[in-house]
Amino acid sequence: MKAFALILALMFVTSAPSVYSFKLKTIDGKDFSLAKYKGKKLLVVNTASKCGFTPQYAELQKLADQYADKVVVVGFPANNFGGQEPGTNTEVKEFCQKNYGVTFPLSEKVSVKGDDIAPLFKYLTSAPNPDFTGEIKWNFEKFLIDENGKLIHRYRSNVKPLSEEITKAL
């Protein structure tokens, strides 16, 4: 009986979803998977170029550089809040590189809420974590994923990327 319970538990653990399950596209339109970052933490951020929080791109890049051995920052441009990401993927990429020197991975534009929510964000907004679940409230919400692809923390937009709250969790 114990062996059966162990087998069931292992089946559940191995079949539980993780961020590695989702098919994504880069801002250049190429297929990619977050699975390439297994073994490192991920900081997934919904971004926008015309938002009061847009200067966080600079801190996100600093975080990506300073903690490159521990975490990969991945930006997901989204136009869900006040039309603050109206540009094309090419325009978004150029804006981020020119104004903030962004070199961390960016996905193509996605929807992070509503009927057309991207599957990754549907998962992230409902996945158990010690902080909170539910719909994203604004641009630059952050999701910290562990080395095994599980959500471990979620931060609202006002939490800066280099805050102690985030850096201690790395």
Question: Which sequence ranges carry the predicted segments?
Answer:
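Structural recognition of the beta-strand scaffold that forms the well-ordered cores
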Residues: 42-45, 72-76, 105-108, 144, ...
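Short, internal strand/loop/helix patches
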Residues: 90-139
